[in-house]
């Protein structure tokens, strides 16, 4: 746990992290738990016993974000929530699917944009009841495809670009109800979704060469930014997307 993460105090806060069983989601969930929050995570398997990772200390909910009925049900169940982190996703091309196929494109948009919108909308009233210092928050996990065209993932890219817009819309509409909405756009960061890309030098080497800080990210890099954006220190920040990318977006 890095010092900047442990410096936050979220004692008593109730946090939901979708896709919190591995990768970036697991890093975010662990950071909130270390800061004193009560953390609920979601995953696709039946129970925590089905995972190799130690998920003790979390409340666990099974959720397939492609199943909108499940998404709506999980959202309705959140009668007390202060922070929602929409993180769950899947790299469809890594499963052999082509996002240029219209049906796969639609799946990608549903997974990475529509599900998060429905989750946030379903949690809105409970978030509005939050008394968390700095206000309740919705966080979306974006990516470099929010800014750059990446040919292999047109659906994912469309969804992550759309995330910037829906984040601003939620911030404008829900701000008067005490709810802030922000996003982070994550660069090449170690996770289950990026494992194949990081293992491929033809992909990872050029990315690293363009990154001024000279390394790929780790989940803790993202977690620190997310905790800041949902903290009282960021109580006047809403509708923004913060790149967490080692400087990739500013490198020519």
Annotate each predicted stretch with a short phrase.
Residues 125, 172-176, 235:
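Alpha-helical segment proximal to the catalytic Tyr-Lys
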Residues 183, 205-237, 246:
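C-terminal helical subdomain
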Residues 120, 159, 167:
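Active-site helix of classical SDR
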Residues 14, 21-22:
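Conserved glycine-rich cofactor-binding loop
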Residues 91-106, 129-134, 152-155, 195-199:
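Conserved mid-core segment of classical short-chain dehydrogenase/reductases
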Residues 143:
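Residue(s) in the substrate-gating loop at a strand-loop-helix junction
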Residues 2-6, 148, 227, 238-252:
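Short C-terminal tail/terminal secondary-structure segment
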Residues 98-117, 139, 163, 213:
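Catalytic Tyr-X3-Lys loop
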